[in-house]
From Swiss-Prot:
Pathway: Phospholipid metabolism; phosphatidylcholine biosynthesis. It comes from Sordaria macrospora (strain ATCC MYA-333 / DSM 997 / K(L3346) / K-hell). InterPro entries: Phopholipid_MeTrfase, Phosphatid-EA_MeTrfase_fun. Keywords: Endoplasmic reticulum, Lipid biosynthesis, Lipid metabolism, Membrane, Methyltransferase, Phospholipid biosynthesis, Phospholipid metabolism, S-adenosyl-L-methionine, Transferase, Transmembrane, Transmembrane helix. Residues 1-32 are annotated as: Disordered. It catalyses: a 1,2-diacyl-sn-glycero-3-phosphoethanolamine + S-adenosyl-L-methionine = a 1,2-diacyl-sn-glycero-3-phospho-N-methylethanolamine + S-adenosyl-L-homocysteine + H(+). GO terms for biological process: methylation; phosphatidylcholine biosynthetic process. It is a multi-pass membrane protein. It comes from the Eukaryota. This is Phosphatidylethanolamine N-methyltransferase. Its EC number is 2.1.1.17. Catalyzes the first step of the methylation pathway of phosphatidylcholine biosynthesis, the SAM-dependent methylation of phosphatidylethanolamine (PE) to phosphatidylmonomethylethanolamine (PMME).
Amino acid sequence: MSSSAADPSAARLNSDVRQRHPTASAASEDVEDALLQQQKEADAAASRAKKTYGKTPDGTVFVVPTTHDMVTQLLDPREPKNLSDVAVLAIIALHFLAAYYLPWGVKRPLFAAIFMFWRLAYNVGIGYLLTIQSKYKLLVTWAKRWKLFENPATGKNPRPWLYNLLKKELETKIPQDYKFEEAPIEYNTWLTFRRVVDLILMCDFISYCLFAIVCAHKPDGEGFFVGFARWVVGITLVGFNLWVKLDAHRVVKDYAWYWGDFFYLIEQELTFDGVFELAPHPMYSIGYAGYYGISMMAASYDVLFISIIAHAAQFAFLVVVENPHIEKTYNPPQPRVRSESEAGSQLQEVASEYSVPSTSGRHNDNSPQPVHNLIGLKNLDFFRITDVAVVLLSAYLAVVTMVTPNTRFYQALFVLHALAWRVWYSFGLGVILTMQSEEKMFTRHFLKYGESLGEAWRQWKGIYHLSNCLCHASFIAACYKMYEFPAGGDNGWALLKHVVGLGLIALQVWTATSIYESLGEFGWFYGDFFFDSKRQLTYTSIYRFLNNPERVFGTAGLWGAALITWSRAIFLMALAGHFLTLAFLAYVEKPHMQKVYGRNLRDDAGVTKFIKRSLPPPVTEWQQSIDKVLDETKHFIDEFVEAARSRLATGSSTIVKDTSALFNKYPARLTISKISADLAGYDPKHYGLSLAGTPVVGTNEKATGKESPNARVLKDVKTQSFEYGAPIRVKWTAPAKHSKKDWIGLYMVTDNRSREVTEVPSLGRWVPTNPGEYDTTTDQGILVWDQPVEKKSEDTDLVEGEMIFEGDKLWWTQGVFEFRYHHGGGHHVMSISEPFEIQIPKFDDEHRGVDISAGSGEVGERAVEAALLPVIRNCLDRDPDIAPSNADERFGGHVERDGKYARRVVYAIRHMFGIDFAPAVVLADGNVRRLAWRICHAKEVLAPFSMSHTNGRTTPVDSKFSE
């Protein structure tokens, strides 16, 4: 027996101790469990924070799993491989085998063709797929229609083997956070699309490199240092290209690399740093520097030219495919402002431009802004003196250049002529702008003679535009005179100089275009020198990367021309032009910008910030010391110029004082004579169409008094007439067994000769009778379908439906139209509606009791507003986000994005009021009230030339002739 058993008290003590030990241990375990639980929750929260969430168009939110780039997936042995990887690698291997075994004479043209095939597959093939996905979600629609991702367990998938293959392929690549069955169909479609992209991109790059290898050679007579420099520059460009691609992929990940935003959006802020601060669209611009590096290493003009073609095709892909989608997705139109608190202070600045005498005497504070721009061929107007002067002087210069001989005298004369225009353009106009900035000299000159600020602004724009055009025209003429066709022994270098020179010229043209798109007409002509600008500085387009793009890129064309001509005189001209441009920026533009915008000016642009962050500390310190020396030098020059400013101002003041639809029909008519085999059993008498719309003209207005008495009698049959742009409802009737692919199209009555077969395409003006049968967004017009009709005959069961034609499905012109019911996706006509008319009623001021041409003031404007508002609402599709509900509300942002709305409005105004406006007028005015003011103002100006009784007569019959 133990001692504890013999001693009861000891036994109780031991028992208590044993009981207390488990209690303490349990408490400790609870604390540990709590800590572990907290750690797990923290880890889960951190994991959730690291995860990316996607959102489909229908609002489904899902976790976007981590994926890897195509090179890693294909070539990294640590990554799992699947059947599609094997297929891609096999096709790549075929390229290498062809490059190795084919005869030498066949390799070059064959690989050029292979590369162009893959490049077309990239830019045209992928571009087409992305376009239809962006506009219609067509890739996702195809996946739904083919039931690619429908679980076979439901019994609805006709191809279970394909489902299992896709499941295995995709889940092998994404082992975490991804289940094939649970992922949204948009994400699965994107993953499938990625595999096609991987094949095309890899083959595109491999075929290009093999073509370069096939074409590579050492030029005859090339020295060691030239060859060494060629390889160093080429390797540097390829390395730079590789860094651009890797850094771009680091920023945008696979989501943007594979155009994921065409399928779904990610719920996080998009940040663009690194290479995206260096250049616009770096993957398509500087991201192709490696092409030119490989061309240098290959020393082949064939590789260079095919690189230029491929690069140009990539820019076309960017403009046609990506930019429209980016605008639609990330830069949608701003919500329409439904009230205007600002009365139009900016309008008052230019109201004086409309200084036509008014008989009404009304106040024109809300007069609209002018929209007659100068820049661009589309704005060329031979009724404007500036444009006429530019064209005539340029033509004179071209004729003189062509007819004069290329002697040294004329060459020197043309160079001096170009230099004089360059000095006037930079120095002369710079002095005028400086005096305008400091003293408003240019404006004061016109005010002195009773002119307005608007007149001064117009005259300045004309002077600047004429000087700009003739400065460049005279430089081109000088280059023409100095150009000599390269000799036979210099063809190699001459070709390179021409290619690089043309590239520099294209760079300057692109820079000027980007500057104009960013600044607009106001900024291009230095409008803030003339008006008190209330605009905020926005660094968009090229200004996102550079503060002054003119400093380097703005004169690139001068150096390009110098390379092409290879003339010392043109090199000196380019140097002088570059120096004058830098001086203009430093002494004219920069001081004014600092005075007007002050601290709102940023110090460093995107490129500068990136370079400063990339420099090591010693280089940064050296750069700061150099900046200090340059600042001190600049201050010295500023003091020197300030001392001579009064003399320059006096001299320049003396100089200043003393000196416009494609065919509606398809080009080839298509007559379908073969009737569908399944047409048997369908009787056209069982089909019917009826219309409902907004009527516009009564039958009593059809009789004008010019007809015979019999023709004035009202007929039983009344032709329907609907408002221009108003939606039209179509009710159809068909047999219950009608084809689900039937469709109804809208046509002009005169477009089709046959009543049995439609001969012309519908051009998008059609709606199917049943949803889900076609791949585009035509289903949007369907309202009701396949509703049983009360049986009126015992032989056929009928159904009916209703659809609406609006927006782009309408004809935006006047005329007589009809609807046609077509069978089974073909063009065989089963029924034709009664013809109806689309008409724009003319504004009849005589019957309205106002005479807007005679200055009836606000009464006339209100009458015009009342007549114009419903028409404009129709033109803007009656969309509450675009169309105004009253005369003061501004038009929606879509009007500025899509020119079709403005063209509809000006067409309606031309037929309502007889006034022909440019579409830009609609954008400038922005609401019905200003448009009404402009219409009244135009009618007032044209009143003496009107043929109507109220607006005037062509012959002054009220006054007697002198005897």
